Amino acid sequence: MNLNKYIKSHILSKLAKDKERKVGIEVECFVYTKNHKRLSVNSLNEYDATNLFKELEIAANGDDIGSFSLEPGGQIEWSSPPFSNLNDLNDSLQKYKYLLDQTLNKHDLINLYIGVDPFNSPESIDLINQEKYELMNASMEKNGTLGKWMMRNTSSVQLNYDIINERDACELAFIIDCLHPISAYLFSNSPYQLGQPVDNKNLRNYIWENTDNSRCKSLLDHGMVYPNTLLDDYVNYIKTVPLIFELDNNLNPKKTKYQTVGDQLSDKYISAELRKEDVEAALHQIFTNVRFKSLIEVRDIDCLPFKHILAPVAFFSGIVFDKKNREKMLDEFSKWDVNERKLWNKSSLTLDLNQDGPNGKSYYDWVIWASELSISGLRRRGLNEEIYFIKYLSSVIDNGPLTLQSQNLFLKSKESLQKFIFS
């Protein structure tokens, strides 16, 4: 087995049976004090985000509620258990919210489910005191313009789907990558920056596009064009990406002497010192809109208001879980011209459905096409899961994505932004 096969075998190490595929989600949110200040992550004298995380971790222990983690700017992330049924996932989501609200209320804290911090510059937000994130911060300073914004001031909803086999992995990643402009529009919820409305700028999407050209963006931007070779192409790609950190003998992140992921993994593979944890750490240093771990992860969704968090899960699940939809999308997307796809990806930075899309159709046409397919797939499952998407979709089609809806309501309110958001 060569190195590429070793990496690929790790990605394909937790295959599910076709009828047993599950989905899990990761939900990030910001936390503010009662005075509407971001909760610090490193306070020495006051209750901070680190204390909050530890309290949540203890409260969730043994309750099968999922797990909590702490993001670099103090955002709280919850990871659900995996489920095959979105109604069961919803039950888990409600348990998480109840536990989070109970804990926040004890300390007069407020959560905010939004894609980008509406008020603060990244310079005003402490970075968590962890080696991994300090190394990441240093890397972002050298390799992009908005990495500090990404680390400190963004929150998202991420989806993790089981892989069935290699062909499934290739085709799903290709389909999800092609869907990026659609999901980026439907699930945009970043209306404000530094206290000001952003107009029709798709802000969180824009921040990620300008974070690190080597490890972000779409798979298409890194030469992954064809579904049949996508996983092999992905393995070749990750080997070229600059390495942020490596793991020491105790599996803790440390500064690395290697230039790229491939340099480190090759060296350890040749010396028979390569561990599965080294491969896993390398895969987690890739931030494309869709990426492989031992799952397929969808990463291009803004954090949405709590009541809408399952909307993107339903949208993607109506496609991922439905063979008919996957075949139809694979057939359609395989016809698209690469340059058209690149132009459409750029169009997703602006919230305007009147723009042109691929194959002679408008942005609007493709949003409707994909959404209707998703709903039909959900209905074929017969679990009433379409309820999590249909009303949300109708609102977005009629009034624009939440980024635009929020700004319109704010301008009509005549209130200060703080009062509008927190009241």
Where would I find each of the regions flagged by the language model?
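Long, well-ordered mid-to-C-terminal structural blocks that present hydrophobic/aromatic surfaces
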Residues: K254-E340
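Loop-rich catalytic cores of soluble enzymes, especially ATP-dependent carboxylate-amine ligases
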Residues: V116-R291
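A very general structural signal that marks isolated residues within well-ordered alpha-helical segments
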Residues: N35, I164-E166, I182, L304, ...
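An exposure/low-complexity boundary signal
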Residues: D221-E246, K361-F389
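Solvent-exposed residues in well-ordered beta-strands and their adjoining turns
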Residues: Y32-T33, P81, D162-I164, I301
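Structured core elements
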Residues: F30, Q158-N160, E297-R299
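Terminal catalytic/cofactor-binding subdomain
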Residues: M1-G147, N153, E171, S294, ...
